[in-house]
Design a protein with these regions (language model features):
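Non-catalytic terminal/accessory segments
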Residues: 1-364
Length: 364
């Protein structure tokens, strides 16, 4: 494989198209590359990451070394609390991975990468096509989600098309404070002045359209949010401030015990419903497994859930998720045997022998 890459005889295979459910009920297409392509893409991704890591801006968090969704959530939380933010732009780029313009992307990569072999490999991957239901389809635009090279290519594309532009815009055009936190194609902006927020909406649409991108109008919202939002809305006879979702969390305004403004996070409802639905399907498939094996599987699921969503203030959602997991296990065991009917009393005794982890707060 190494010799093929160096000699130029390497030819990538089309990616296999599959679909995974999204939080809104739609299907997200992903591309599954062949093993050889995964290996080569992984090597090239490491090279590109080493080159571009020094260029990427501080508010970009997705798929970067030493950064995680929690770093992005914490950075957003700190900015909303400590900075003068009164308005939030919850932006959603429409079908980003399917809409990446190949020529723009290759020009952006060539800005920092002079090796023609790297550029040729990237072009080959972009044009390899997809296999769906046994049929081959051309890929004239986009980079498939699921491919090992796609995250770094997405960051490069958004670095030039969005990040650098926003950085200059808030220095030259804004009249008040402006913050942004981006995780791959998901980003949130905060504004001190409503005029800045409204100007950004128009300018952002024009900027993205230049690169073949656009905002999802149904999911992109400008909302009043911040330390004074509740008081101002109350004076106008309006309800409490709206909430917004980012990286699986619903963010909302509140006051702590000392009366200071705080931003709390809870599990995004749509995400939890989708996860429980998938677990119910899995539980039916595993209902004839030995009880110890089932318990280990569900315990791992719960620990992973607590590890991601275990923020201070999210106890109710964590407890609800734990209850729903116990409930779906109970129902799966009820289907397992018609002779020895499972009751809640018997199930609770079983939980003492095969306990499940209790909700834990692991992040503040």
């Amino acid at each position: 494989l190494c010799d093929q890459v160096h000699s130029g005889s390497y030819r990538p295979q089309p990616v296999r198209r599959a679909y995974v459910p999204k939080a809104d009920g739609a299907q997200r297409p992903i591309g599954i590359p062949a093993l050889e392509d995964k290996i080569v893409q992984g090597a090239v991704a490491e090279v590109l990451s080493a080159i571009y890591e020094v260029d990427f801006l501080g508010f970009s968090y997705g798929f970067r070394p030493g950064r995680s969704p929690h770093h992005a959530v914490d950075a957003l939380n700190a900015a909303l609390i400590k900075r003068k933010i009164n308005w939030v732009l919850d932006a959603d780029v429409r079908r980003f991975f399917d809409s990446v313009d190949h020529e723009w992307l290759l020009r952006m990569v060539a800005h920092r990468v002079a090796d023609p072999r790297i550029l040729r490999l990237i072009r080959q991957w972009l044009l390899a096509g997809v296999l769906e239901s046994g049929k081959w389809f051309k890929t004239l635009e986009g980079t498939p989600q699921g491919a090992g090279i796609s995250p770094i290519l997405a960051n490069i594309f958004l670095h030039y098309s969005l990040d650098l532009w926003v950085h200059v815009w808030r220095q030259r055009c804004a009249n008040g404070e402006v913050i942004i936190v981006r995780y791959c194609d998901d980003f949130v902006m905060g504004f001190e002045k409503p005029t800045d927020a409204e100007s950004m909406m128009g300018d952002l649409k024009r900027r993205l359209s230049k690169f073949g991108l656009g905002l999802n109008e149904k999911k992109t919202r400008l909302l009043e949010f911040g330390r004074f939002a509740a008081e101002r809305r109350k004076r106008r006879g309006m309800r409490r401030p709206e909430t917004f979702d980012f990286l699986g969390f619903t963010h909302y305004c509140c006051m702590n015990r000392k009366g200071h403004f705080f931003v709390m996070r809870k599990t995004q409802r749509a995400r939890m419903i989708r996860k429980l639905k998938a677990l119910r399907t899995e539980a039916r498939l595993r209902m004839h497994w030995p009880l110890r094996k089932q318990q280990r599987w569900l315990a791992a699921v719960l620990r992973g859930h607590y590890g991601y969503y275990g923020y201070l203030g999210n106890s109710r959602a964590l407890s609800n998720f734990a209850y729903q997991v116990r409930k779906l296990w109970f129902r799966a065991l009820c289907r397992r045997s018609q002779k020895n009917a499972m009751t809640w009393e018997r199930f609770n005794r079983l939980l003492k022998v095969f306990p499940l982890p209790v909700p834990r707060i692991v992040r503040t």
